[in-house]
Amino acid sequence: MKKTLTSEQCDVIGQIIDRPYLALWADMGAGKTAITLHAVAELLRLGFIRRAIVVAPRAVADSTWRQEAALWPGTSHLRVVTLRGDKSVRREQARTPADVYCIGRDALAVPGLHRGCVASPDLIALAGDAGRAMLIVDEASSIKNSQSARFRALAWFRWGRVLELTGTPAPQGIGDIWSQMYLLDRGAALGKTITAFRQRYMRRKECGFGFEEVPGAAPAVLDAVRHLVLRLEAPPPCDVTYRDVYAQMGDAELEAYRRFKKSMVAEIQGREITAVSAGALVAKLAAWASGGQYCTDADIRETVRPHCRKRDELTRILASERGPHLVFYWFNFSIDDVKSAARAARKSFACFDARHPEIVDAWNAGEIDVMAAHPQSAGMGLNLQRGGHRIIWMTCPWSSELWLQAVARLARRGQAHTVEVTRIIAPGTIDERISHVLGGKIDAQKLILDELKGG
């Protein structure tokens, strides 16, 4: 069936053409990849740009843009090249004549460089004549850290056009916006430096670590950048239901968890577990709730198991529900739990690996019953809706961005079923705190996007 754009999507294409520096804050599933490719095709036809450079999460850079271009009559002629492989292969790919070059955000900077130009040879090769190139930052919230090498690498060049794409521009609040806006206007709206921005809109937290917004900062910041932002809403592509199931630890297991929380030291299966700081304790409590701990003995690299309640609950769910399941994990030891649960439920298993994009095709073809995936690698930009409609979280993230993006891998256009999202919670543990904090961040993100409706 021939694919066509909606009238609203066509209007956005016109805005991209007319506004060289633009942040498109689009709901997930709004079709921002297709919109952008059509805008690129028109800009190339008009001679406004010579090439487009797409910076994206690795899995998205490897497959999504090329596949999307091939789906549309208006973009199927675009020559899309992805830079991947070893150094010599990438060098040849950068020299290959093309309209769109895709590069993983992990390949933007040279590791270890802290001064001057930190851009990688790949990015430098693509950025030749940057004034006639269009930079497209897919999932632009990935450059929210102004100290990151990837941000400094992109900011080194003066691009002829910049388009930023994201559905989650401020997952931790308005402090995430400065670097995104700087890449568009070099600091004209929010200040030339992050320090100037913080002096005006932020203050140090009472604990002395980190910053928080001053009263009234959010609407003031959004008013200041309104001319740089285009808000694109999308109707919900499908219904989404949420439920929590509980993996209850035994009394002795829960008591051991509480002792560790208080003392920051424990012994499990003869191995020492120590939290050296408050931050380390938070991470280890989340791991404990999920059923594992990494040893802190200097000479031992081993995972020990304080309980297996989440694995058992996952086994029960997989055995009782038909259809494929996308299982998001946070700790690597959970991969073994998902694999074990799938085997016990007599279902096929695979673990998503961004280095092997063919696994996306296998999932969408219905060849995988249970796919384990980390939200940082598979949570952004991938089209997984044809492969299933059930999501299970072994461990919820603190980040609203990772949560929303991960759920949107199935809850997007083309999904034929209600998406069912299940969280496995260990009662009496940090899982409950994470769930509460996550809900607040999702609400704050929605308020920011709602502020720019019609902008």
Which residues make up each language-model segment?
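Inter-lobe coupling linker of SF2 helicases/translocases
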Residues: 102-108, 121-129, 144, 148-160, ...
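Conserved Helicase C-terminal RecA-like lobe
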Residues: 1, 17-18, 30-31, 35-48, ...
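SF2 helicase motor core recognition
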Residues: 109-111, 172-174, 333-339, 359-362, ...
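Conserved helicase motor
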Residues: 59, 81-90, 105-110, 144-147, ...
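A conserved SF2-helicase RecA2
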Residues: 398-455
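Conserved helix-turn-beta segment of the N-terminal RecA-like "Helicase ATP-binding" lobe
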Residues: 60-85, 184-187, 346
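Conserved helicase ATPase motor motifs in RecA-like P-loop NTPase domains
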Residues: 28-29, 160-174, 182
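Conserved pre-motif I regulatory segment
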Residues: 1-25
